[in-house]
From Swiss-Prot:
PROSITE patterns found in the cross-reference section: PG_MUTASE
Entry annotated with the keyword Isomerase: yes
Organism encoding this protein: Staphylococcus carnosus (strain TM300)
Highest taxon in the source lineage: Bacteria
Record's function text: Catalyzes the interconversion of 2-phosphoglycerate and 3-phosphoglycerate.
Keywords from the UniProt entry: Gluconeogenesis, Glycolysis, Isomerase
EC nos: 5.4.2.11
Protein name: 2,3-bisphosphoglycerate-dependent phosphoglycerate mutase
Length: 228
């Protein structure tokens, strides 16, 4: 039976400062490192053997993956990185304090941007856009696929092709697969796997640094899930 382990990265320094992060490549906080290493210890204690791992190209997810694999003595496991597993792009909100954004735009508007399924925040500024296009992580990509802002729906539409092309084929061979990513890219996968409604998925909370283990049937249908 295929097993899928989803893990949201440990707390980042911008999570701790209550800032919109998105594609900004910030590091884990000390708490985030502790969350990831503790979960790696749990993987080892439970004897969970991972066959292949996937993560984004953002360091907070990559480092979480490393801590999970290092603490469970599984650094040899093949690891694949893709921009398609990045966090939702928060456009012009990136770098703003969430409370300050509520004061500037209004609490209701910020809530709509954060918790609507198909409404994106304002586009990235020209400076932010230039930085994304110049980032080595995205060299070789058609600039049209690099977002200026995303809704959760937009995030799902870039995540699911990677699920279909890279992740699902590994699961279909019966492997145990780790996906260490971000709150919204994982929401996209959860919506796809469980068939969660548009209305319900936006409020779905995912713990930081805590492996969420899915048991799937041979056709990758949802059977059960639990946090480690």
């Amino acid at each position: 039976m295929p097993t899928l382990i989803l893990c949201r990265h440990g707390q980042s320094v911008w999570n701790a400062e209550n800032l919109f992060t998105g594609w900004t490549d910030v590091d884990l906080s000390d708490q985030g490192v502790e969350e990831a290493t503790t979960s790696g210890d749990r993987l080892k204690q439970e004897g969970i053997e991972i066959d292949v791992a996937f993560t984004s190209v953002l360091q907070r997810a990559i480092k979480t993956t490393y801590h999970l694999l290092e603490r469970s003595n599984q650094l040899f496991v093949p690891l694949y990185k893709s921009w398609r597993l990045n966090e939702r792009h928060y456009g012009g909100l990136q770098g703003l304090n969430k409370d300050a954004a509520r004061e500037e735009f209004g609490e209701e508007q910020v809530h709509i941007w954060r918790r609507s399924y198909d409404i994106a925040p304002p586009d990235a500024t020209a400076e932010q856009r230039e930085a994304d296009l110049a980032d080595r992580k995205y060299q070789g990509l058609d600039e049209r696929v690099i977002p200026t802002s995303e809704s959760l729906k937009d995030t799902l539409e870039r995540v699911i092709p990677y699920w279909n092309d890279a992740i699902a084929p590994e699961l279909l061979t019966g492997k145990t697969v780790l996906v260490s990513a971000h709150g919204n890219s994982l929401r996209a996968l959860i919506k796809h796997i469980e068939g969660v409604s548009d209305e319900d998925i936006v409020g779905y909370e995912i713990k930081t640094g805590a492996p969420l283990i899915y048991e799937l049937d041979d056709n990758l249908g949802f059977v059960s899930k639990h946090y480690l």
